[in-house]
Amino acid sequence: MLGRWLIFAGVAGYLLTAFHPAPAPVVHEVQMGARGGNRFEPATTTARAGDTVRFINGNGGPHNVQFFPDSIRDPARDLLDRAMPGEKLGWLSSQLFLDRNEVYDIVLPKLAPGRYPFFCLPHAASMTGAIVVAP
């Protein structure tokens, strides 16, 4: 009797997880230099693999997105660098954005949960942020 119950519980658990749809990808918007300030708004964004983090140049820049390579371990560094589209200023660094409302999308790859800090190269002293990858 106990054996049948365990089999039933195992099958039910499998069915609940196998057919539970994954959350739909979400677009998270981050303003760069909005309202005349040199900052990212919001400064911290929580996202999952498959979500898009959309950086929007709010004031015409120049702005960019540069991840701190020393704070990100392999293989996450390489995965994140490959997820950054277009021409780059360097490793883990987007190009400069000069036009107001210019958009830069990063579709998050499957990264280990944790904090992935970034900054704007021209305004590094005050313009910092982070993507927190949720499990």
Question: What does each model-identified segment do?
Answer:
Residues 5-17:
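Bacterial N-terminal signal peptides
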Residues 1-2:
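N-terminal secretory signal peptides that target proteins for export/translocation
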Residues 14-135:
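Extracytoplasmic copper-binding redox domains, predominantly the cupredoxin/blue-copper superfamily
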